Regions:
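Short, polar loop motifs at secondary-structure junctions
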Residues: 9, 25, 34-40, 54-58, ...
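Glycine-biased, low-complexity coil/linker segments
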Residues: 352-354
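Short, well-ordered alpha-helical microsegments
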Residues: 42, 98, 120-121, 180-184, ...
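Binuclear metal-ion centers of metallo-dependent hydrolases, dominated by the metallo-beta-lactamase
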Residues: 128-129, 143-227, 299-344
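Short coil/turn segments at beta-strand junctions that form active-site/ligand-binding loops
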Residues: 47, 108, 166-169, 192-194, ...
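C-terminal regulatory/interaction regions
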Residues: 2, 213, 221-346, 360
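Conserved beta-strand scaffold positions in the cores of enzyme catalytic domains, especially
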Residues: 22, 32, 49, 71-73, ...
Length: 360
């Protein structure tokens, strides 16, 4: 059996006709298997959705209770028969609940990675290498120039700046799902026990992470805090908020941005970032190539990102490779713009909730 007889790229995403499903479809379909909760992979409007419990919960937080006709949760490692194929979900190390999807049929095994990283993250299960015949990999940072710095060193750089400028506020642009919580957890791991402030747009998902047992220490909402109270503290906010009037209410703010794209100095300058933090939730070039080799796959399909460069590398290693050229996937580190939605869905309020005045 050929891999193309099991999975095939279509305008709506990777389709498994034998199983009657799509993986991370880019438009509404009858049955969708979703790798993780970022909006370019997890869309509302499908007839049925199969995903990890965390991904389903995150979709519900973002889209409301009726984001799909029906939903089904699957545990890591659990096998499920769908039509003529067997599927299972395995940790991808990208964000909480993120998964690779393994599809097996008549002796052929295909693994769709979704977005992934191969470095430790205290807020989600680590990436699991799965042996397969065909590996479908992302390529967000699929160029040799992208070699991410050690994330711990970037956190140390942030803390040195806070110590050097105690009279200033530090605003860290980070995306609401995954990056924000990872940065906070790494700050705690580095011994930073001071209150971390949150923009209101970060609250729902950060609360959800805490409800799943992830300890993020003392957090307060920015609204209700006096300007003087924010000096010497770190505030986590959507990247777009750093250019808003909102940011002018902080005392002489230092603008930081946690993203793999901060490896490109021009992007940092364009965003007015004075403290770029190269912290990514995607594998860098070395992570992509080492992961491909570790899977033992003889064939690699490359999607969303720098497809051609990674295909070329695979061919140079004697592997069969092709780009999938599916339109509709982006990169949350570059294009996700979080609205300032301060509506609440989970109990156990953060310190500072409901206080009047101050910054929101």
């Amino acid at each position: 059996m050929r891999a193309e007889d099991i999975l095939a790229p279509t305008p709506a995403g990777v389709c498994c006709k034998r199983g009657g499903f799509y993986i991370d479809p880019t438009r509404p379909v009858e049955k969708a298997l979703i790798t993780h909760g970022h909006s370019d992979h997890a869309r509302a409007g499908h007839g049925a959705v199969l995903a990890t419990q965390e991904t389903l919960d995150i979709m519900r937080l973002r889209y409301g209770d009726n984001f799909a006709g029906t939903t089904q949760a699957i545990r890591y490692g659990e096998e499920l028969k769908l039509g003529g194929v067997t599927v299972s979900f395995h940790p991808a190390g990208h964000v909480l609940g993120s998964a690779q999807i393994k599809v097996a049929c008549e002796g052929v095994t295909i693994v769709a990675s979704g977005d992934y990283k191969d470095v430790r993250d205290p807020t989600c299960a680590p990436f699991e290498t799965i042996q397969c015949d065909v590996f479908i990999t992302e390529a967000t940072f699929g160029l040799p120039v992208f070699r991410h710095h050690d994330a711990k060193g970037e956190i140390d750089k942030l803390l040195r700046s806070v110590a050097l400028f105690p009279e200033r506020a530090h605003l860290v642009g980070a995306y609401s799902l995954g990056k924000a919580q990872r940065v906070i957890a790494m700050l705690r791991g580095a011994g930073h026990d001071r209150t971390v402030y949150l923009h209101g747009a970060m609250e729902k998902i950060t609360r959800y992470y805490e409800s799943r047992g992830i300890d993020l220490g003392e957090l307060e909402l920015v609204r209700g805090a006096k300007k003087s109270e924010l000096a010497g503290h770190i505030t986590i906010c959507p990247p777009t908020a750093m250019g808003d009037l909102w940011s002018r209410r902080f005392p002489d703010p230092v603008f930081a941005f946690a993203s793999g794209w901060m490896r490109v100095r021009a992007r940092a300058r364009q965003r007015g970032v004075t403290l770029p933090l190269v912290i990514s939730d995607h594998a860098d070039w070395d992570g992509l190539t080492s992961t491909i080799a570790a899977t033992g796959a003889s064939e690699v399909w490359v999607t969303h990102g720098q497809e051609d460069a990674l295909v070329h590398w695979c061919v140079s290693q004697g592997l069969k490779a092709r780009p999938l050229d599916i339109v509709g996937y982006g990169d949350e580190e570059e294009s996700e713009f979080v609205a300032s939605d301060e509506s609440l869905s989970i109990p156990s309020p953060l310190v500072g909730e409901g206080q009047g005045g101050g910054v929101s």
